[in-house]
Every structure is written in C-alpha cells, then in structure tokens.
C-alpha cells in the first residue's frame, strides 16, 4: 500500500539527532573523512519521520538528515495515549516489537526507539529491540512497525465487520 505524502510545512516539527558517526573513504592519498547523521523528526501529534545525511561537517550532515526525514514522514494512528495494537518491524538485522500500554506507563523504550515514539506523540508504549542494535536499523525497524498500525475503524472496514465485532 502506497503511503500518501505528508506536507511538512503545515506541521510544527521537532527534531532529535539519534546518531552521529565519523565515516571514512579510503582513497589513493589517504582517508577522506565525512560525518554521517541520523535524525528523527516529529510533531508529537501522530507524524514522524527518519532521515540520514552525510557531509564533511557535522552541522551540514544534520541539516541534510533533517531534510531527508521531512521527505519520509508517516502518519501514526494513536488511540488515547498509546497505539491500537502490537506490531513487529524488521529492518536489516534489527527487529523492534511495539506493544500498547495502559495510561500512565510512559515510554518504555531504548535510545533510538524512544526518540521515534516520543516524537510520534505516543505517551504510553512498551517496546523491545531484538537483534542488531545499530541505531540506523533500529530507527528504520521502529518506523516499519509504526507503518503496520491500523485504527480499529480501518480494520473493521477492511474485514467488512462492525466496529463492535472488532473490539470485542
């Protein structure tokens, strides 16, 4: 299913740098150093995106990552303060399990997953990061898990049932 593009101009986006890494390209004369940045942006109201940027200077890498993240925004269905149901996201060797939690639980998540959940506006959630803990893959796996979420009304419509049948 194709994701509809979300216009970042109408949103009050906050950004959070998840990881900055120094990377090198080995050339004949030695090593060419650059910086790689992973940034998560979100409006804390159901929209979140992640981006990657690379440049010779750290601020430029962060700026590029923010631009990339704004191009890859997704909408997250939030029910009350949590998510509608469990989901598992896979990306590379990383796997992220996200589960709804009762109000007052808070965001129980590790570094990269926490950044995505908080900027998406999820207040109560339990997560478990499995496999690789590479920040780039964990962020993308979390986004994949959030993409799988469906509102109860949407599930009822797809299955051709009433909302009451789905919620019981």
UniProtKB/Swiss-Prot annotation:
One of its GO terms (biological process) is translation. One of its GO terms (molecular function) is rRNA binding. The keyword Transferase does not apply. Residues 13-76 form the S5 DRBM domain. Pfam families: Ribosomal_S5 (PF00333), Ribosomal_S5_C (PF03719). GO terms for cellular component: small ribosomal subunit. Keywords: Ribonucleoprotein, Ribosomal protein, RNA-binding, rRNA-binding. InterPro entries: Ribosomal_Su5_D2-typ_SF, Ribosomal_uS5, Ribosomal_uS5_bac-type, Ribosomal_uS5_C, Ribosomal_uS5_N, Ribosomal_uS5_N_CS, Ribsml_uS5_D2-typ_fold_subgr. With S4 and S12 plays an important role in translational accuracy. The N-terminal domain interacts with the head of the 30S subunit; the C-terminal domain interacts with the body and contacts protein S4. The interaction surface between S4 and S5 is involved in control of translational fidelity. Part of the 30S ribosomal subunit. Contacts proteins S4 and S8. Belongs to the universal ribosomal protein uS5 family. This is Small ribosomal subunit protein uS5.
């Amino acid at each position: 299913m194709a994701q509809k593009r979300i216009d970042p101009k109408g949103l009050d986006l906050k950004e959070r740098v998840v990881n900055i890494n120094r990377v090198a390209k080995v050339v004949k004369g030695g090593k060419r150093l650059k910086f790689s940045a992973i940034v998560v942006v979100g409006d804390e109201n159901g929209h979140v995106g992640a981006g990657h940027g690379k440049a010779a200077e750290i601020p430029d890498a962060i700026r590029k990552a923010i631009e990339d993240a704004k191009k890859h925004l997704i909408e997250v269905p939030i029910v009350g303060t949590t998510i509608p149901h469990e989901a598992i996201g896979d990306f590379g060797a990383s796997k992220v399990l996200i589960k709804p939690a009762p109000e007052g639980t808070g965001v129980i998540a590790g570094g990269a997953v926490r950044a995505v959940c908080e900027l998406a506006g999820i207040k109560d959630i339990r997560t478990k990061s499995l496999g690789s803990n590479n920040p780039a893959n964990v962020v993308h796996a979390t986004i994949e898990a959030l993409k799988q979420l469906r509102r109860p009304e949407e599930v009822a419509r797809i299955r051709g049932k009433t909302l009451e049948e789905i919620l019981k």
